């Protein structure tokens, strides 16, 4: 049986931590664990997911929940409540529902104070890892039999009815993920006609019916070239000389978005080496199976720009294709011949220096799973027996997650982000005395997860920004500062600092709070908006060079309304407690941030969400930021427009339901389901509360709260519904903890802001 291990790791030559592995979450298979009854419940959960996989595609993340609730002997002892038709919500009913949610959620806290959860969803995360392990000869050691079984389960569970796989679990089938999933199945031992429900045959038919893998997007062309199932001459150039360009040029690594930089860093190394893995009998078979013509007869030069229409979200502009063609025809032939190949060798050396720097400063976690696999493979190409590659191997478990739909690869984990939101939700419940241990543990996790230092050495030369005082998305070992993660964690620390230490633990040292403020202030742009990782400011026209076909806005840093709002809320609270610290800068930040939020409002009154689905998500953040400075419906036109948008999109059942299609389409799309989405309902409910809706007309709030209460499950949990996370416009993320955090938080804010406080015996 699979078991989740928390904060486990043993320092050695290849594995080390900056904070004793706080926040680390790894899965291990124990063949002797679990009773027959426990194993039967897991199988029941797997079967239930399989039977309903086309109805609700995100899993309910049940395996670790079953484990934690069992280990803590949790039983819901608070009676369930429902709001009948025509019945008003009493303070007692709201209190009972809230307490049930809080007691259940508190039982899910890990021993180190965070809440584990899946953060995955894209279907291109896992196959490259399997391919990398196959190429390097570590497949069977990294993925023993039970791992392979769960990986295949995941692939089967998320195959679409037409035989393909989407870019993410709710998406339409794409060539990229269908081909990668097919290859993954074949590497893991399935035959060309094998797999559950003829998975391989159906996938291959989809591939051939849609033009074969010559139409795979650029990332797919790169991975297939590495594997030996495509030819490098059929890819667009990724010259490593990019890393030795003079800094005054507009196209320079220092001006790139950090994710783009750290992905194309190892990718350009592998391209510069023209690395190809061993050509095994399986690779030769794939060359036959994936094409609708003989492999040796393919005109590779003509397929560089070919991309299946199902994958094409961002068509390359003419100027970009012209650049690729110029590099392909003129530059590459020179750089691969003497004497210019000396420059190529120098570029490869510098590129690998940057790869090692990023690896070391993230404890070999890297920024995320896409970079992780590419950097790991680059290290192996440099030295198959070297320490760098072995350190990468030691961190693979940090990315793997097991649920009832199988084993997948996470982006990097969302431990700090989830914990900060969870703590604020619990504090809003005003149950501090009852959940003191939960709050203490959560507070301790937040304090121990703060990044204590800047990147090593002369980090600016390595294109890095300050990180001391920040919080990463996952844990301290990751080390990468994120503005909204920092702001939300700072809010928690400030809230805790005003509470009795015997209830929530000792407050954080003010100096460390100042460090957090320094990071936040450093990331504001001239337009008042806040970027996520590093300061924005590179020319917008560089986005014309976006080399991907299925993402948008990946070349440079951009400002985000969510990050800006989080920072405003944190700094307003900070200013009240520390009015003398960098007063002018804090005031200017807040004023400019508010102006940015007002400036980027959509004509319909909403805001576009960059990290959640979509206009409802961003509207909740924006209204929270405006409310923090005293702006409401009565004194702010932007708030009035936003309220009109939210009330206009409220559904007949009292909730809200926004389709993920809003994100790529950039217009509001309603869910095509009869039911509303509870997470989005909570966002809208809290946004309206921020606006002052309770003083105008509380009826929309009552209707929303009724929906949340009536959908609560017997044990205090809430059901998993549609996916609610997103990145880069077009790819969705499943944050499995959202279904607990936000309905709980929404009910808590409703109870303390809408209902008249009364005391009741609710048990």
From Swiss-Prot:
The keyword Nucleotide-binding does not apply. GO terms for biological process: triterpenoid biosynthetic process. It catalyses: (S)-2,3-epoxysqualene = delta-amyrin; (S)-2,3-epoxysqualene = beta-amyrin; (S)-2,3-epoxysqualene = alpha-amyrin. GO terms for molecular function: beta-amyrin synthase activity. The keyword Ligase does not apply. Its EC number is 5.4.99.55, 5.4.99.40, 5.4.99.39. Expressed in the leaves and in the epidermal cells but not in the inner tissues of the fruit. PROSITE patterns: TERPENE_SYNTHASES. Keywords: Isomerase, Repeat. InterPro entries: SQ_cyclase_C, SQ_cyclase_N, Squalene_cyclase, Terpene_synthase_CS, Terpenoid_cyclase/PrenylTrfase. The active site is at residue 484. Belongs to the terpene cyclase/mutase family. Multifunctional oxidosqualene cyclase producing delta-amyrin (48%), alpha-amyrin (18%), beta-amyrin (13%) and 4 other minor triterpenes. NCBIfam families: squalene_cyclas. This is Delta-amyrin synthase. It comes from Solanum lycopersicum. The lineage of its organism: Eukaryota, Viridiplantae, Streptophyta, Embryophyta, Tracheophyta.
């Amino acid at each position: 049986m699979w078991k989740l291990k928390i904060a486990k790791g043993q320092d050695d030559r290849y594995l080390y931590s900056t904070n004793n592995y706080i926040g680390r979450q790894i899965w291990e298979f124990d063949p002797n664990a679990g009773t027959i009854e426990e194993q039967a419940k897991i199988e029941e959960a797997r079967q239930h997911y399989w039977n309903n996989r086309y109805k609700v595609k995100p899993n309910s993340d049940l395996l670790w929940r079953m484990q934690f609730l069992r280990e803590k002997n949790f039983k819901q002892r608070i009676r369930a409540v429902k709001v009948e038709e025509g019945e008003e919500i009493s303070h007692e009913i709201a209190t009972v529902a809230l307490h049930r949610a809080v007691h259940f959620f508190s039982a899910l806290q890990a021993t180190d104070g965070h809440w584990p959860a899946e953060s995955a969803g894209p279907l291109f995360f896992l196959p490259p890892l399997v391919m990398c392990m196959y190429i390097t000869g570590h497949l069977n050691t990294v993925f023993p039999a039970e791992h392979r079984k769960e990986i295949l389960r995941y692939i089967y569970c998320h195959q679409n009815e037409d035989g393909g796989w989407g870019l993410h679990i709710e998406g339409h089938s794409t060539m990229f993920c269908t081909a990668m999933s097919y290859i993954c199945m074949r590497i893991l031992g399935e035959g060309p006609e094998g797999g559950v429900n003829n998975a391989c045959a159906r996938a291959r038919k989809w591939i051939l019916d849609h033009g074969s893998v010559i139409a795979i997007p650029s990332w797919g062309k790169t991975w297939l070239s590495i594997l030996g199932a495509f030819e490098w001459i059929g890819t667009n150039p990724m010259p490593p000389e990019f890393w030795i360009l003079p800094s005054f040029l507009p196209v320079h690594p220092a001006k790139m978005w950090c994710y783009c930089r750290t992905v194309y860093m190892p990718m350009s190394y592998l391209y510069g080496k023209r690395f190809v893995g061993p050509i095994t009998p399986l690779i030769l078979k794939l060359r036959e199976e994936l094409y609708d013509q003989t492999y040796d007869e393919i005109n590779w030069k003509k397929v560089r720009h070919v991309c299946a229409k199902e994958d094409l979200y961002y068509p390359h502009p003419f100027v970009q294709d012209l650049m690729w063609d110029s590099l392909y025809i003129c530059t590459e032939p020179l750089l691969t011949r003497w004497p210019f190949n000396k420059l190529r060798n120098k570029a490869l050396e510098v590129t690998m220096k940057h790869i090692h720097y990023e690896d070391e400063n993230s404890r070999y976690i890297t920024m995320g799973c896409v970079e992780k696999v590419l950097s790991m493979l680059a290290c192996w190409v440099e030295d198959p027996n070297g320490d760098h590659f072995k350190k990468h191997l030691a961190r693979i478990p940090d990315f793997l997650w097991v649920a009832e739909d199988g084993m997948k690869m996470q982006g990097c984990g969302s431990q700090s982000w989830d914990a900060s939101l969870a703590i604020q939700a619990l504090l809003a419940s005003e149950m501090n005395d009852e959940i003191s241990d939960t709050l203490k543990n959560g507070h301790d996790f937040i304090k121990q997860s703060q990044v204590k230092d800047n990147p090593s050495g002369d980090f600016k030369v390595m294109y890095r920004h300050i990180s001391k005082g920040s919080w990463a998305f996952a844990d301290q070992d990751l080390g990468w500062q994120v503005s909204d993660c920092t702001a939300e964690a700072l809010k928690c620390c400030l809230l805790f600092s005003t509470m009795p230490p015997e209830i929530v633990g000792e407050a954080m040292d003010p100096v460390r709070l100042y460090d957090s403020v320094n990071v936040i202030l450093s990331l504001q742009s001239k337009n008042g908006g806040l970027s996520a990782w590093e300061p924005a400011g590179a020319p917008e026209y560089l986005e014309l060079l976006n080399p991907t076909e299925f993402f948008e806005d990946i070349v440079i840093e951009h400002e985000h309304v969510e990050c800006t709002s989080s920072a405003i809320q944190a700094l307003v609270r900070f200013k009240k407690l520390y009015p003398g610290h960098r007063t002018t800068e804090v005031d200017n930040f807040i004023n400019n941030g508010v102006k940015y939020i007002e400036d980027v409002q959509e004509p319909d009154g909403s805001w576009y969400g960059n990290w959640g689905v979509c206009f409802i998500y961003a509207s909740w953040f924006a209204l929270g930021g405006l409310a923090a400075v005293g702006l409401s419906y009565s004194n702010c036109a932007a708030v009035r427009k936003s309220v009109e948008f939210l009330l206009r999109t409220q559904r007949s059942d009292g909730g809200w339901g926004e389709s993920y299609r809003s994100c790529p389409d950039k217009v509001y799309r309603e869910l095509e389901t009869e039911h509303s989405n509870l997470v989005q309902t909570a966002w809208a409910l809290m946004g309206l509360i921020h606006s002052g809706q309770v003083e105008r007309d509380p009826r929309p709030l009552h209707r929303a709260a009724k929906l949340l209460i009536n959908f609560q499950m017997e044990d205090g949990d809430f059901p998993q519904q549609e996916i609610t996370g997103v990145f880069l416009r077009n790819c969705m993320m499943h944050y499995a903890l959202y279904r607990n955090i936000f309905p709980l938080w929404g009910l808590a804010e409703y109870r303390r802001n809408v209902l008249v406080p009364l005391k009741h015996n609710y048990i």
